[in-house]
Amino acid sequence: MRRALLSGLLALLTAAAPAHASQLVTWTTTSRYVDPAQLDFNGPPRPKALRVNVLLPDGYTPSRRWPVLYLLHGHGDAYDSWADPKNGDVARVARGFPGVVVMPEGARGWYVNWWRGGRRAGPAWERYHLDELIPLVERRLPILRARRWHAIAGLSMGGEGALFYASQRPGYFGSAASFSGAISIQRPEWPSGFDTQGERHDDVFGDPDAQRFYWTGHNPTVLAANLRWTRLYVTVGDGVAKPSEAENVFGQAAELDLHQHAEDFTAAAREAGADVTYVPRDGIHDWPYWREHLAAAVRWGFFAPARESPSDWTYETVAAKGDAWGWRFEFQRRAPDEVITFSRHGGMLRGDGSGRVAIKPPHGRLFVVKLPFARRL
């Protein structure tokens, strides 16, 4: 009898215990494109290293494949800000989230390859995150392959990064979200305001007149057509702090400005035919509201069905190399000095702009062509 009671109690305890609680792990990565020794990291003194926080979900096991969310931080933050209980508190806010959450370092880099007088380097964040980090994640973790299972989101500067990266890898990311994002970066007040934050606009995006093409090629609002087949979630505050939260003059002013960014982007994305969920809310530019934004986006659902391989798309870029819906391209001799447009409509592939480019189709042999071109598939 006693043995039977002990066995029954053990069975109850086993049934009540979770399979595995979520687990936060930190990776240190290397890069050919970003030198951590040259960076000014945000937050307390920390080693000069490119670190990534990875939140493994409840019940994680490497024997099955998982969805993935890339979660980007803002201008004054670091790779550990989303996981910090005082800031993003992601483990609590997204408790029960059904996928892996990858939170990389972005310093104050704006998630772009810095113009730097035309070198497009020093640092090249886009190359690090898209060409090095994503492949590293997929080598180390069993990630589901279809684009519906790949999402990206971010706050403020990270909102710009999330929508920009989604625009440059539309065949990879099925969903993208911006929380108080800087997502309409060619508004008249932008360059002068940008220069007050510590970086020079000319270094990051180029001179607003002489390198307007480079600036344009990183503006999510202008690139909205790239996101036609991407599920989009955009949320922003109204610049008014809730009575229960502390007031913050900078946070109020910043959110008022970024509210217009959200309006600009949402209008452009809807005009392009994208599926946009736009949620203007109460609040200012501060962590209590971003936690709410993330929780609401989780309820919206990062991994709902998304079109896998549309035969009708437009892709604009200033990148020297990239991937447009599985059509990998690399410009020969020199990088573009204008916004390049690739498009597919049924059985016809087109390229508009100038330059010589090598293109590798998803299925087929590499070919080299001079722009502009039209090629029947």
What residue ranges belong to the model's regions?
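Bacterial N-terminal signal peptides
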Residues: 7-15
